[in-house]
From Swiss-Prot:
The keyword Acetylation does not apply. Keywords: Ribonucleoprotein, Ribosomal protein, RNA-binding, rRNA-binding. InterPro entries: Ribosomal_uS8, Ribosomal_uS8_CS, Ribosomal_uS8_sf. This is Small ribosomal subunit protein uS8. Transmembrane segments: none annotated. Coiled coil: none annotated. One of the primary rRNA binding proteins, it binds directly to 16S rRNA central domain where it helps coordinate assembly of the platform of the 30S subunit. One of its GO terms (molecular function) is structural constituent of ribosome. Belongs to the universal ribosomal protein uS8 family. Part of the 30S ribosomal subunit. Contacts proteins S5 and S12. The lineage of its organism: Bacteria, Pseudomonadati, Pseudomonadota, Gammaproteobacteria, Lysobacterales.
Length: 132
């Protein structure tokens, strides 16, 4: 069965696992999911990520969630651009999440990066999601 929005699936799985206190999340892997998870790891929202081969020879992404004093580090995880309505922003129009306390993950011509990195690189792109 094909998935219409794999990025939304990734975000919902992370949000649901954090809500019930799970340590890890396993889901089918893709290049964009790994890139988004790598940004989350670089920004300190998750502990680790691993790509492994499942028994059916499909790549599987395992994300190790991060908690602080028993509460998940990720409080808000929201999809912005979606398959039915893509949201593109220029370098001067990139959003700031919670006045700079959160991040927006942007898909640019130079790869997937945070809003701050995109501003620094002077590029705009598709605003994938917000994390706080």
């Amino acid at each position: 069965m094909s998935m219409t929005d794999p990025i939304a699936d990734l975000l919902v799985r992370i949000k649901n696992a954090a809500a019930v206190g799970k340590q890890t999340v396993k889901l089918p892997s893709s290049k964009i999911k790994v890139a988004i998870a790598q940004v989350l790891k670089d920004e300190g929202y998750i502990t680790d990520l691993r790509v492994t081969q499942a028994e059916n020879n499909k790549a599987e992404l395992e994300i190790v969630l991060k908690y602080f004093e028993g509460r998940p580090v990720i409080e808000t995880l929201k999809r912005f651009s979606r398959s039915g309505l893509r949201q593109y922003r220029g370098k001067t129009e990139l959003p700031k999440v919670l006045g700079g306390l959160g991040i927006a993950i942007i898909s640019t011509s130079k790869g997937i990066m945070t809003d701050a990195q995109a501003r620094e690189a002077g590029v705009g792109g598709e605003v994938l999601c917000f994390v706080a």
